[in-house]
Every structure is written in C-alpha cells, then in structure tokens.
From Swiss-Prot:
This protein's encoding gene: tilS
Domain of life where this protein originates: Bacteria
Organismal lineage: Bacteria, Pseudomonadati, Bacteroidota, Bacteroidia, Bacteroidales
Protein name, per record: tRNA(Ile)-lysidine synthase
Gene3D superfamilies cross-referenced by the UniProt entry: HUPs
Organism, as annotated: Porphyromonas gingivalis (strain ATCC BAA-308 / W83)
Domain notes: The N-terminal region contains the highly conserved SGGXDS motif, predicted to be a P-loop motif involved in ATP binding.
Amino acid sequence: MKISLTNRVRTTIRERKLFREGDRLVLVALSGGADSVALLCVLRELGYETVAAHCNFHLRGVESDEDAAFVERLCRDLDVPLHRIDFDTVRYARERSISIEMAARELRYEWFGQLRKELAIEYVAVAHHADDNAETMVLNLCRGTGISGLCGMPYKRNDGIVRPLLDATRDEIEAYLLDQKITYRTDSSNEDTRFRRNLVRHRIMPLLKELNPSLQEALLRTRENLEGVAAFYSKATEDFHNTLRATSSISIREVKETPAPFTLLYDLLHPYGFNRDQIREVATSLDNPPGASFFSSSHRLLRERDRLTVLPLSPKMEVPELFGLKIGDSFLDLPDGKQLSWQRGTPADLDLEGLRLPNTKLLLPLAFVESLQEELGVRRPQRGDHIHPYGMKGCKTVSRFFIDRHVPRSRREEAWLLCQGTEVVWIMGYAADRRFAIDELSDTEEYLLFSFGL
C-alpha cells in the first residue's frame, strides 16, 4: 500500500524527532515552488501552527516578483502570517567572490536565523526532499567529502533547520499537490544547467539511473549505512572534541595512538577553517620538534611539545603602558583581563613571602621607579628581547628562557614584560632580571612590591 505524503512526513517527524514534544510553532521557508507549498500544507494538516518566510533574490526579473505576489496571495488565503525580504544577490556574490548559489544560501539562512530570534520560533522547516538529497550526495562525492558529506543533508541541524520532506520523493510531492488541487510556481532557472545542482539533476542523475533504475533506493540504503558509520565515528571522537572545546588543545600522543590520525585531525580542525593540505601537514609534523604554526582565516594552530593548541586570531591589542601611572594607584588592568598590582611601603609593611619563587612578585626601590617612571612600560615579548635571569649566570633571549622552562608557545605569546626602555626588568610571573633585583633591603627605604597573577 502506497503511503500518503502526509503520513510519510508524520513518520519522518516522529522517527527523526524533528520537533520537541508539544512544540507546534514552525517557521516555513516558502519560495512558492511545489516543494515548499506542499511542506506548508502538510504541516498545517498535521496541526502545526505555521509562519511563512519568503526571500526574493531578484535573480529572474519579473518572475521573482510574481513568485513573491503568489506567496502573498497563498498566505492570505490560508491565513498564514508572512515575513518577506528582498536581496541584491548578484551584488552580494560579486563583493564576496562566491557563486550565486552560495550567495543565495548564505543570505537566506542568515535571515532565517534572525527571524528565529525575533519571532522566538525554535524551528525553520525547509523543503528539501529525497531527490534533492540524492543530488547532494552525488555533488559531495564529486568534489570530495567525508562520511557526513556522503550522508547528504541532515534531517535536523543545530541551528533549528529541519527537513520534514527528506524521505519524500519529488514525484510524491507533485502527486500530492495534484490530488489536493493546490497550485504552485515553477522556477524556470531550475532548467539552467549552468548551476551545478541543475547539471546533476538533468544530466548526471539520468545517466546513473541507466546504470541502476533503482538509484533512489540504492542511495537511500547507502545513506542509512553511512549514518550508522557516522554515529560510531562521532562517538569515538567525542572525547577529542570535548577536550579541544574545553582546553583549546589536544594531546599529540593520543592523536598518534588512533588508527587514523589524519582523519581525526581533519574532523577536529576543519571546523576551525584549516584546509585539507594544512591538516595533512599537521599530521605529518606530529613527530617533529615543537614550534611550528599553522594559520586558517580565523585560527592559529601551534605545535607544542606534547600538544596541539588552537587559538582564535585576534586583532593586535594596544598595550597600556606604565608611564603616567600615579604611584598612589594600586593596579593596572591589562587587555587580556590580567592585572598588575602594587603596594608601597617599607619591608615591614609589605608581604615579601615568595618574592623569588615563583616570581609572581617583583620588588623595586620607590626612588628607582619614580626616577624611571617615564621609561617603564608593560608590553608583550618581541623578537630580540633579552633577560639576565635572577639566580642564573649569563644572558639569554626571552624566547630561549621560555623554551628552557618548557613554557607552551601559547603561554609565551600571552606573557607580559615590565620593561625599562628596551631592557626587560621582569618577565611578569616568571623571572626578574638580576640587574634590577634587590639583594639587600633597607628597613627605612620605601619600595614598590609588584604582583602579577598568571
């Protein structure tokens, strides 16, 4: 017995848990075409309260405006609230050097996200169906993809997008509309094979069906098999994802112990903007000495002694300086949320415990600070900085000091220096320069005791 479209959608919603129990309000992406019109009508049949959202991308001249007018009439006849928006899609694509298809996709989903917040609606239903998903699987296969790409479109996304028609075919949708005598718009651009999806739909899929007339069923079985594999894989990598989110780093040893380090690294790093070639290079560098850096458009990956650390790129911060500070002040807030504080007094007034170790404190004569106040400043380390570490002989670069102390690269770049001109007085929280250190204290002299917490 052939299942009706309404029952098929009901089953998909239930089995795929598209909506929370009792949640009946849905925003429907309504283009006016057969798929979206059928989706709107079926959801209403199933008792959902619907709100429609229509995008006019202005790609087909008068046709686009006629689509918008049709959607307005349909929503008025069905008493469905409608929200609509106009986009200059061609300009958007040109400014970002992306395809028209990608531009329309970005514009519509960004707007859907805004509408969800404005209307306090949890779900946005889009009308992708089984034929669309088969085309997506083929497209993804042709350009190269992983397990999730071979599965095609997800039934439900984390951003509230749901696809109730994903188990229904195009033929079933059109048969439903014909049976219900429901009219819809036909998009003439769907025949334009300059668009990749249309090329797959009109040329590649018919050829594949010559090889296997039951292509739709075969791809469905493949999808189901891959979904199972994807579920196992997701469970196996869950701890790595959780660790990376919580600490911004992962253990190199643990990555190397997995059966497929590159596959794992691709899964972990691709969401941060790293491409396949970069991730391949990261994977081959796991046994190399530390120090290498890799950059995506949004993040930096640091190859440290025993960990891979991923940090967001941020604009260069302006470092506040100590010149101009009033000795009567007691602290200086730094841009990253850390704080340098100080106390003024004689040795009897100050808490000097732990002054040398772990170097979270620095004692300087008040007279020295007052005389050099205009030359004192706080900044990040830079190439060529040197220090004569207290308790050690000789001089070394600040970078060598960090390496010898096994300080991770990410921590090095977050360090602060108290400097007198070009001289490093204190690697704040790590080591004072012995040239500025005080070996003998005067009971009557006043000092400034600087404190810094890592």
